[in-house]
Design a protein with these regions (language model features):
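Local sequence-structure signature of Cys/Sec-based thiol-disulfide redox active-site neighborhoods
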Residues: 24-50
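Secretory pathway export signals and precursors
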Residues: 12, 33-36, 73
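N-terminal signal peptide c-region/cleavage motif recognized by signal peptidases
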Residues: 18-20
Length: 151
């Protein structure tokens, strides 16, 4: 097999991967957030627009949920659980899909803080501003490495 054909096969497989995940049915996401957080609602909309089935749980304090999910050091304004993984903050749907395809031995993903330009922090009220940031893969011991860089 020549390199060109191999490249085409790899590209075709990569393009079909999101379709494969969707073919298995909608992925359920549970989100814990405070009742007044608008950017959390915008992130929930982003996830729904990308094919996830989202259930929200309004709580007064997301801290205990975050700690129980292994994300205490990577706080943002909401914590989600999807297929056994924690998703802390404004993580893009495509990174969650990649996580579900790769299935790493990890606690989950985190976008610490509230980075401008990330899903839910990208509405007109932010004036198109973007903050360079990383989505982190958080291991089960609390350590992390860059999963995807946004510059």
């Amino acid at each position: 097999m020549n390199v060109s054909r191999l490249t085409r096969l790899v590209l075709a497989a990569a393009l079909c991967a999101p379709t494969f995940v969707m073919a298995q049915g909608p992925v359920k996401v549970d989100v814990w957030k405070t009742p007044t957080c608008g950017c959390c609602e915008d992130w929930v909309k982003h996830m729904r627009d990308n094919g996830f089935t989202v259930t929200t749980h309004d709580v007064q304090d997301t801290g205990p949920i975050r700690r129980n999910a292994g994300m205490a050091d990577y706080g943002s304004c909401h914590t989600a659980m999807v297929d056994g993984y924690a998703v802390e903050g404004h993580v893009p749907a495509r990174d969650v899909r990649r996580l579900l395809l790769e299935k790493p031995d990890a606690a989950g993903l985190a976008a610490p803080g509230m980075p401008l330009g990330s899903p839910g922090m990208d509405g007109p009220e932010y004036g198109g501003r973007k903050t360079p940031h990383d989505v982190l893969l958080v291991d089960k011991q609390g350590g992390a490495r860059v999963y995807e860089a946004y510059r």
